[in-house]
Amino acid sequence: MSNHPQPSDRARELVRGAYDMHVHTGPDVIRRINNDIETAQRFREQGLGGFVIKSHYAPTSGRAALTRYLVPEVRTMGAICLNQAVGGMNPLAVEMAAREGASLVWFPTVDAENEPVGRRPPVPGANIPFWAHMQHQLRDEGVFSEAVPVVDEAGQVLPETRAVLRSIAKHDLILATAHLNRDEIFAVVDAALEEGVKRITITHPEFPSQNLSAPDQAALAERGAFLEHTIASIYFQKYSWELVFDNIRYTGIEQCYFASDLGQPSMPPIEDGLALGADQALAAGFSETEVRCLFADNSRRLAEQSPA
């Protein structure tokens, strides 16, 4: 970790009280840099407000509740990710996660129809995500994880997708679009609004499997969705700071926020992620007020309406 850059004191102060809405902590089936409790303790030391635990494979609301008990100064929030490990588009899984205190529902990630890399035979030497290695290992062991559809062949959301959206609306949870493709994102967002979902966030819109243009991002922001720009993907060289900042300038900062998406052992410490991003934004010419909105205020506005 000593090889990673250190955030400035100015950036640390600007992100004080922030929520990181997308982190990968242990225990997990994929190796992580810290466990939930260690992460909460580090957030407390840095004056950060809270974080959402993401697992591609299991609900995290129970882990979050225990972490809040042990580190009450930090609001640790749980979630569920609708991959095959929880039954895919499974409204019962969402209902149980909500009753256990979950704050956020990610739509499919590793099992999204839009993410075939984990279902294809691996290409020797290819640079693939950590989770894709897990998918390949499972297939080698005869455990098949098929794609989770959210729309039909005509692009209309499936009945089970609407049932999930109704459960999200009922419990006032946050909907995150995860690894859906562009057309799926628009279909799901429009259906979510029809079903009464109040909080929607578009997960890493610049990520190659989403690749939303600036006009697309603006159209989603006009619908009331937040745009979650993730820092880990920049470190993994999936896209650049310049692209993200250009898109934010196009859409305006009101519906944009940054999350780290950190927790991978090769990456910077989770608790440094937002401050490192704030330093980049300052260097790119954003004002302190704008940086505070992008890295703290907007994520708090999204998170503080959640039940946990």
Question: Which residues make up each language-model segment?
Answer:
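Extended substrate/RNA-proximal surfaces in nucleic-acid metabolism proteins
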Residues: 74, 87-203
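Active-site core of metal-dependent hydrolases
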Residues: 24-30, 54-57, 76, 82-86, ...
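Histidine/acidic-residue-rich catalytic or RNA/ligand-binding cores of hydrolases
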Residues: 29-33, 61-63, 186-191, 211-217, ...
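An N-terminally biased module of ancient metal coordination in phosphate/nucleic-acid-related enzymes
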Residues: 1-74
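Short acidic/histidine-rich active-site segments
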Residues: 253-270
